[in-house]
Amino acid sequence: LDDDARYQSRRLERRFPGHPAGRLLPAAQLGASDAEVGLRAAGHSIKVIEATASSAADLGKVLQQLKTDRVAYWVLDLPEAQFAQAVQAAGSSALLFNASAGADALRGSQCAAMLFHSYPSQAMFSDALAQYLAARSWRNALVLQGPEAADQLQGQAWQRAAKRYGIKTVDTKAFKLSGDPRERDLSNTRLLTNDRNHDVVAVMDADGEFARTLPYATQQPRPVVGANGLVALAWHTQWERNGGPQVNRRFARLAQRPMVGQDWAAWVAVKSIAALVSDHSKAALPEQARLLRSGQVFVDGACMTQPQAPAE
């Protein structure tokens, strides 16, 4: 979407941890380029096209055109609210890959047979953080909870992960960024973090603006985790294993910026599509979906499976 709030210039300039750093087209193009030799050897090719809608109201026309043009693989970079529309439009005529939305509902109540996720869920991010805290024996967390619906969903995922890995929430305090003088205490980081009985401060801030200045601003000298400080990411530009430096360098040359998690998810989605086209081109799309779920499709030597949200 041209008016996608995640890509407003102000937000991109802030470079909030875990947020997109730019549109995902360069990452998809890199995935196709990286897969070109293998595809050519198998007698196949793929073409990356960009389909954009000016707004959510115009999205239906764009999706219908993709279906009319028989585009069989869609890499989605959409807000969560538009996924149901994309799934309905595609039906069984396209495989869909979510490359940027971490909402747990897309893996649960809104799960679809033809929808796969190359981008991790909020539950996965929360599990990663909780596992690390447990490994370091940082068992007591002060939670700073934002007021927005997305903040609440982050908080719910965190509480499930914390319970699973034995992280105790010693207190939950609400924060709010506001120009109202009567609410200034809700944005006072020193006041919010004044208690001494916690090992870490876990901040649930989907927007990122409050968390942006929280590290090193707490009253007690404690690590900040969640939306800033120690952040669970799908990818980092300094990852040095599994061919990471080479991928990062190729992407930086193409996009003129570092690769972030959403870029990696788009890249690996296209690589997954290339693997399907190369090895299972004669299979119908529902059968290709089954092969993806069964772990029989290999991407760069690793099994590609559909991430699932942990059970309650």
Regions found by a protein language model. Give the residues of each.
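Extracytosolic ligand-binding ectodomains
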Residues: 1-312
